[in-house]
């Protein structure tokens, strides 16, 4: 107990010295956060051992000490990374390196030089709201390189330049729906009017709306840090548009093709059954009239069974070939079936020859959606050529293939997982997966973002792709890996990678 009190008092003295001297170097800020981390660890240790008070300081619960220690560790790592950059020699005060400043908009960024921005709604000076614009914002790119960017304000909101993009971290339209009745506001910086009153219905440079032709030619691309508030009708329209643009359509082409195939198969089966019934009646009559019923019935039963088996095989082959050609109709399928059924009435050797011909014709036809049995056997024996990897566009079946055959089939349609989140979170997740989950995946991509079709602004959060060798490997990865907080995932596959 006495040792804990002495160590705690020593840490308190170090913190008081830092606060009194108020250094403006990055080394001093790192030392400040290191001292806060030690203090949180000491209080955590005291609480674990049932100590409720260290000197005059009450010991908080374990969750509070743990959160403070983790916060201090995160700030130390970020400040050490910033210290290695070209901006490490700049003056950094306690306020610049504080957690409150780091978490203020734009969140998770270091910033300097606060400037007050006042927005007056409905031309009423009493109906105003104050915002903070930072003169400089420091951010990391996908390669963990630090950049220093200037911040600005316009009639849409407050932003900072991230390369060639305008990254908005304050949007005036968000608060206009709460404080304004007419949807108009006026922007003032240092008590000087910068932009005349504009309406929230058609903001000229809004990230979510259309921009003027003049404004779009003069204003660079924009991206936003928060979602603009719109009417439910507009939100539903945007949601449907995004679903059609980046998602799969509800009535996809594969579903329509599958339904069409089932209808054609049912028609061909019904027609083949009606023909087989008519043939069986004809044969029964001929048997009654014949002189040697036993021999003829045996011969006809054998030839009839062979003919029916061959007829079904050729009917399926003809239907598949017509369906692959894309221009056939049920009428053409039935006519082809009737012609071949006439040739098969003799049964026996003629039927086997026709079956062999049907197999040759079906194997030579193009098969984008389903491979023949001979092709599957050749794939299992000889493997897959590099040019065929990623060419399959159908879901792999687990029947009649075996483990090796399934793996080879899955190689034609490589599965992936798309994760969405903050860039730094995704990069940390990738580095942690490389250390802990080696063998559960094939490869990771870098962090990337979607770009609007009518502009260059980034849409939504950053994304990262994870590729796998097989669907079973993806399943093992998804069940084993713990995804970071705030990271979403979705499954998919590509023709090739």
UniProtKB/Swiss-Prot annotation:
GO molecular function: DNA binding; DNA-binding transcription factor activity; nucleotide binding
Entry GO terms, CC: host cell nucleus
Subcellular location(s) of the protein: Host nucleus
Record region (DNA-binding domain): 413-497
Comp. bias regions, Low complexity: 215-230, 315-341
Post-translational modification summary for this protein: Phosphorylated.
Basic residues: bias regions: 242-287, 295-305
Keywords of this entry: Activator, DNA replication, DNA-binding, Early protein, Host nucleus, Phosphoprotein, Repressor, Transcription, Transcription regulation
Region feature (Transactivation domain): 1-201
Pfam families: PPV_E2_C, PPV_E2_N
Record bears the keyword Transcription: yes
Segments for region (Disordered): 197-393
Matching InterPro entries: E2/EBNA1_C_sf, Nucleotide-bd_a/b_plait_sf, Papillomavirus_E2_C, PPV_E2_N, Reg_prot_E2, Regulatory_protein_E2_N, Regulatory_protein_E2_N_1, Regulatory_protein_E2_N_2
GO terms classed as biological process: DNA replication; DNA-templated transcription; regulation of DNA replication; viral DNA genome replication
Top-level division of the source organism's lineage: Viruses
Role summary: Plays a role in the initiation of viral DNA replication. A dimer of E2 interacts with a dimer of E1 in order to improve specificity of E1 DNA binding activity. Once the complex recognizes and binds DNA at specific sites, the E2 dimer is removed from DNA. E2 also regulates viral transcription through binding to the E2RE response element (5'-ACCNNNNNNGGT-3') present in multiple copies in the regulatory regions of the viral genome. Activates or represses transcription depending on E2RE's position with regards to proximal promoter elements including the TATA-box.
Family to which this protein belongs: Belongs to the papillomaviridae E2 protein family.
Quaternary structure and interacting proteins, as annotated: Binds DNA as homodimer. Interacts with protein E1; this interaction greatly increases E1 DNA-binding activity. Interacts with protein L1; this interaction enhances E2-dependent replication and transcription activation. Interacts with protein L2; this interaction inhibits E2 transcriptional activity but not DNA replication function E2. Interacts with protein E7; this interaction inhibits E7 oncogenic activity. Interacts with host TAF1; this interaction modulates E2-dependent transcriptional regulation. Interacts with host BRD4; this interaction mediates E2 transcriptional activation function.
Name of the protein this chain belongs to: Regulatory protein E2
Species of the source: Human papillomavirus 20
UniProt gene name: E2
């Amino acid at each position: 107990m006495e040792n804990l009190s002495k160590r705690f008092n020593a840490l308190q003295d170090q913190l008081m010295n830092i606060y009194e001297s108020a250094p403006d170097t990055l080394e001093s800020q790192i030392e400040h956060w290191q001292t806060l981390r030690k203090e949180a660890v000491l209080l955590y240790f005291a609480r674990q051992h049932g100590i409720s008070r260290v000197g005059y300081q009450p010991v908080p619960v374990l969750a509070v000490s743990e959160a403070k220690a983790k916060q201090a560790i995160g700030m130390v790592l970020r400040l050490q990374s910033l210290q290695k950059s070209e901006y490490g020699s700049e003056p950094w005060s306690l306020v610049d390196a504080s957690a409150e400043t780091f978490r203020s908009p734009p969140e998770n960024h270091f910033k300097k030089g606060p400037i007050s921005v006042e927005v007056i709604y409905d031309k009423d000076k009493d109906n105003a709201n104050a915002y903070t614009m930072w003169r400089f914002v420091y951010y990391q790119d996908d390669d963990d390189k630090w950049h220093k960017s200037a911040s600005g304000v316009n009639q849409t909101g407050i932003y900072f330049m991230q390369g060639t993009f305008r990254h908005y971290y304050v949007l005036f339209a968000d608060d206009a729906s709460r404080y304004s009745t007419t949807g108009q506001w006026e922007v003032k910086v240092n008590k000087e009017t910068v932009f005349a009153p504009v309406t929230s219905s058609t903001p000229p440079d809004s990230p979510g709306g259309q921009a003027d032709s003049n404004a779009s030619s003069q204003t660079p691309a924009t991206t936003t840090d928060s979602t603009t508030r719109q009417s439910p009708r507009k939100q539903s329209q945007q949601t449907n548009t995004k679903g059609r643009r980046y998602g799969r359509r509800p009535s996809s082409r594969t579903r329509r093709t599958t339904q069409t195939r089932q209808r054609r198969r049912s028609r061909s089966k019904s027609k083949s059954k009606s023909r087989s019934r008519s043939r069986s009646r004809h044969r029964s009559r001929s048997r009654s009239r014949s002189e040697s019923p036993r021999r003829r019935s045996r011969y006809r039963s054998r030839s009839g069974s062979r003919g029916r088996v061959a007829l079904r095989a050729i009917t399926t082959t003809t239907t598949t070939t017509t369906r692959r050609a894309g221009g056939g109709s049920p009428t053409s399928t039935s006519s082809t079936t009737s012609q071949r059924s006439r040739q098969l009435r003799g049964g026996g050797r003629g039927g086997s020859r026709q079956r062999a011909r049907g197999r040759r014709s079906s194997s030579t036809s193009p098969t984008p959606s389903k491979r023949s049995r001979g092709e599957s056997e050749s794939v299992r024996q000889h493997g897959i050529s590099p040019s065929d990897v990623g060419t399959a566009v159908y879901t792999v079946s687990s029947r009649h293939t075996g483990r090796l055959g399934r793996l080879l089939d899955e190689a034609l349609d490589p599965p992936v997982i798309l994760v969405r989140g903050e860039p730094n979170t995704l990069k940390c997740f990738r580095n942690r997966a490389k250390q802990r989950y080696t063998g559960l995946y094939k490869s990771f991509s870098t962090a990337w973002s979607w770009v609007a079709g009518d502009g260059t602004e980034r849409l939504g959060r950053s994304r990262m792709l994870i590729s796998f060798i097989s669907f079973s490997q993806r399943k093992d990865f998804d069940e084993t890996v713990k995804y970071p907080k705030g990271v979403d995932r979705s499954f998919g596959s590509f023709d090739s990678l």
